[in-house]
């Protein structure tokens, strides 16, 4: 898919730059004037190229923290937004299949059972499953040194022994201290570094059994569910890796979720931390025309801009943004 997209761009007269990143954006009189691209030559020398532009489609990822800092420093309008953090929860896939399919569990026509759960608590907070991976694996998704970040994936056959899902709770702008628009990024980093420390280094992840978590006790060993995180886990407590309001929200939500999915609160299910990158903690504010409200010619798009929260929503936002950009240039 990507190869065909690149080919079509080049056939239409476009240029594709690889192995480079945007390291500066020039804003003059409230409009974008140029971007600076930095790449590394074969001999290791850093090369910079200034490209004059009248329009920039800013479609960075939700973990492009260097871009967020650059935009803030250049005075581009941004705002805090609600995001979510938590852990990965793993169960035996066979148990999930039995809970959802009953006697039909194991039928190859059905395959591995997926689930989607959410719970609204009396506290006013909510917890929810995210990016559930049937027959899948917990993976490492760190993008900065000294931090542990988890994510999940399934191979095409969904034949892994475990299921896993993000188990998240919201972080609201009002939960964040101070007035820095990137306070959410700072909180993500704090949790990721705490997880790195709890995992005793080497990008080992902290892990805890659900039964121990619900009782507020640290875990010393695993049970029947073998963690799939590839760097290994350090048994203990995840309490110190996340803000107390997230820990308490997850602790209250798990038994309630088990009312809808039998066994979700199984004592030997595994929590692996931390999951901090489900969505962007900031939004690059744009108007109805799709452009930045502060910087003409800058078109924030997709997850990193804070207008999408997954593959399909990001793709849809990209299509709509492209249509508005083409209309503005026509």
Write out the residue ranges for each language-model feature.
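Residues forming the flavin
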Residues: 1-330
């Amino acid at each position: 898919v990507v190869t065909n997209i690149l080919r079509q761009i080049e056939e239409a007269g476009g240029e594709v730059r690889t192995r480079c990143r945007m390291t500066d954006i020039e804003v003059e009189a409230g409009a974008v004037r140029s971007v600076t691209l930095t790449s590394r030559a074969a001999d290791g020398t850093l090369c910079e190229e200034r490209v004059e532009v009248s329009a920039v489609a800013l479609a960075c990822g939700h973990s492009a923290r260097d871009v967020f800092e650059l935009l803030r420093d250049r005075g581009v309008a941004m705002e805090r937004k609600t995001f979510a953090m938590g852990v990965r929860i793993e169960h035996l896939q066979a148990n999930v299949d039995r809970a959802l399919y009953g006697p039909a569990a194991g039928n190859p026509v059905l395959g591995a059972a997926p689930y989607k759960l959410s719970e609204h608590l009396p506290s006013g907070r909510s917890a929810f499953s995210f990016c559930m991976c049937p027959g899948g694996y917990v993976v490492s998704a760190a993008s900065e040194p000294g931090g542990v970040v988890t994510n999940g994936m399934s191979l095409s056959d969904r034949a892994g022994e475990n299921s896993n899902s993000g188990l998240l709770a919201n972080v609201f702008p009002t939960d964040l201290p101070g007035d820095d628009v990137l306070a959410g990024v700072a909180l993500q980093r704090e949790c990721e570094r705490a997880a790195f420390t709890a995992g005793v280094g080497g990008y080992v992840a902290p892990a805890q059994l659900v039964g121990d978590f619900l009782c507020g006790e640290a875990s010393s060993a695993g049970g029947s569910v073998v963690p799939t995180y590839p760097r290994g886990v350090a048994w203990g407590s995840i309490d110190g890796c996340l803000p107390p309001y997230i820990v308490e929200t997850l602790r209250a939500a798990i038994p309630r979720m088990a009312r809808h999915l039998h066994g979700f609160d199984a004592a030997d299910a595994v929590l692996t931390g931390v999951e901090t990158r489900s969505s962007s903690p900031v939004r690059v504010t744009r108007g109805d025309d799709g452009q930045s409200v502060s910087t003409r010619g800058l078109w924030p798009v997709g997850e990193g801009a804070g207008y999408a929260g997954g593959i399909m929503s990001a793709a849809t936002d990209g299509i709509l943004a492209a249509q508005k950009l083409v209309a503005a240039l026509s």
